[in-house]
């Protein structure tokens, strides 16, 4: 005779850490109610469920419309570590979607997240920096971060955070500095970025050089890069083992050598030789373009032009490059090098 046996295991489709999701349009409304619950476990389960749903931009749109962002803002100040971690994770996932970034700006999420910049939970800080990074990919998002006065805080955190979070901050800074580098320049960002160029981590070196490209766009940025003796370090990085580090270092030199002081600082650091060496190795498009433009800047100085005259064939070879931008850059370089007063 058969006996009834009750399994000690739950069915495979039941997750005890996640709130049950209601059917259809009621799903997010119910979760939003649970986010506001006084019961800790209910809040935690609702956040875990929300993390899954926010990968779909349609759910993100609906969540914003029913007021989930306001509930999440409140939970950022929760005493429970897991609640804060999952709240920042939900916001980070929402920020990967355009509709989420727009919602952040409308609901002042930038300032709300900034309260956790010094949170003792590493995952909280990592998630909020990921959210800022994705938000900054939207020009208005980058402007929002700048206008919120967060750039000095990000520069300070860059000196204290763990390596993997430093990488995220550098990505955010590079995007924000393209919009406005004023606050960064006033916050000693150039000396900080100079220090990061010397990091043992190639990702940090690469991203620091990329941020220097952005901060060198305004004249004050170019002057600070020269005054802080960053140019010799950038020249050294042209021989780095990492391709992206070399490309970004060449890009930073391209901007920094627009000024006369920058040109001669690069010439004194013997920048021409490693730049020419990069062109002779059939580099990738970005590296080739940046190196060509940097050499063009150096050719504007009589000493640079004299050194480059015998290397014009390298640039003539680039005239047949498959990339039109490199063709144009090579054409300009030849004109500058062969120019006679």
From Swiss-Prot:
Cell compartments where the protein resides: Cytoplasm, Cytoskeleton, Flagellum axoneme
One Pfam family per UniProt: Arm
Domain of life of the organism encoding this protein: Eukaryota
Entry keyword annotation includes Flavoprotein: no
InterPro entries xrefs: ARM-like, ARM-type_fold, Armadillo, RSP14
Cited SUPFAM superfamilies: ARM repeat
GO terms, biological process: epithelial cilium movement involved in extracellular fluid movement; flagellated sperm motility; mating
Family of this protein: Belongs to the flagellar radial spoke RSP14 family.
Protein name: Radial spoke head 14 homolog
């Amino acid at each position: 005779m058969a006996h009834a046996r009750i399994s000690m295991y739950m069915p495979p489709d039941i997750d005890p850490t996640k709130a049950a999701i209601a059917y259809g349009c009621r799903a997010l409304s119910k979760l939003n109610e649970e986010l506001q619950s006084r019961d800790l476990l209910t809040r935690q389960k609702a956040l875990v469920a929300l993390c899954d749903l926010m990968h779909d931009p349609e759910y993100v749109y609906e969540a914003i419309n029913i007021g989930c962002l306001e509930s999440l803002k409140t939970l950022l100040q929760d005493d429970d570590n897991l609640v804060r971690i999952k709240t920042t994770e939900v916001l980070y996932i929402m920020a990967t979607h355009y509709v989420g970034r727009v919602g952040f700006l409308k609901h002042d999420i930038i300032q709300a997240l900034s309260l956790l910049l010094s949170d003792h939970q590493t995952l909280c800080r990592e998630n909020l920096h990921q959210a800022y990074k994705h938000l900054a990919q939207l020009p208005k998002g980058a402007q929002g971060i700048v206008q919120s006065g967060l750039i000095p805080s990000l520069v300070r955190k860059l000196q204290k955070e763990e390596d993997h979070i430093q990488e995220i901050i550098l990505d955010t800074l590079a995007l924000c500095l393209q919009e406005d580098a004023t606050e960064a320049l006033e916050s000693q960002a150039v000396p900080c970025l100079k220090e990061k160029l010397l990091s043992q981590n190639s990702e940090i070196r690469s991203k620091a050089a990329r941020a220097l490209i952005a901060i060198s766009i305004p004249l004050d940025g170019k002057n600070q890069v020269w005054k802080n003796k960053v140019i010799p370090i950038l020249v050294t990085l042209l021989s780095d083992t990492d391709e992206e580090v070399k490309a970004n270092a060449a890009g930073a030199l391209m901007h920094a050598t627009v000024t006369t002081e920058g040109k001669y600082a690069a010439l004194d650091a013997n920048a021409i030789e490693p730049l020419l060496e990069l062109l002779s190795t059939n580099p990738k498009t970005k590296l080739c373009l940046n190196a060509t433009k940097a050499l063009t800047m150096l050719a504007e100085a009589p000493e640079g032009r004299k050194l480059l005259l015998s290397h014009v064939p390298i640039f003539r070879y680039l005239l047949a490059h498959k990339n039109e931008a490199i063709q144009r850059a090579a054409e300009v370089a030849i004109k500058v090098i062969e120019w006679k007063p």
